[in-house]
Amino acid sequence: DANSFCQLPAVVGKCRGYFPRYYYNTEAGKCQQFIYGGCGGNRNNFETVEDCRATCHSH
């Protein structure tokens, strides 16, 4: 599955930045906002909800 990262949990990361981002929540079946610290994390991290939906909509 090319977009298997859509199933990964939201990861804030180790840095202390404040970046509102979106991730695909598999339990809710939709993209939701979380706060990203600015480093680390995984690919389930999108700048816009539109990008999140376009990438992970089929899960």
Swiss-Prot record:
Matches recorded under SMART domains: KU
GO cellular component, as recorded: extracellular space; nematocyst
Protein localization: Secreted; Nematocyst
Domain of life where this protein originates: Eukaryota
Pfam families, sorted: Kunitz_BPTI
Main location: secreted
Domain BPTI/Kunitz inhibitor: 6-56
Disulfide bonds: 6-56, 15-39, 31-52
PROSITE patterns: BPTI_KUNITZ_1, BPTI_KUNITZ_2
Keyword Disulfide bond (UniProt): yes
Alphabetized UniProt keyword annotations: Disulfide bond, Ion channel impairing toxin, Nematocyst, Potassium channel impairing toxin, Protease inhibitor, Secreted, Serine protease inhibitor, Toxin
Any GO MF annotation of the entry: serine-type endopeptidase inhibitor activity
Protein family (similarity comment): Belongs to the venom Kunitz-type family. Sea anemone type 2 potassium channel toxin subfamily.
Function as written in the Swiss-Prot or TrEMBL entry: Dual-function toxin that inhibits both the serine protease trypsin and voltage-gated potassium channels (Kv).
Protein's name in the database: PI-actitoxin-Aeq3a
Organism: Actinia equina
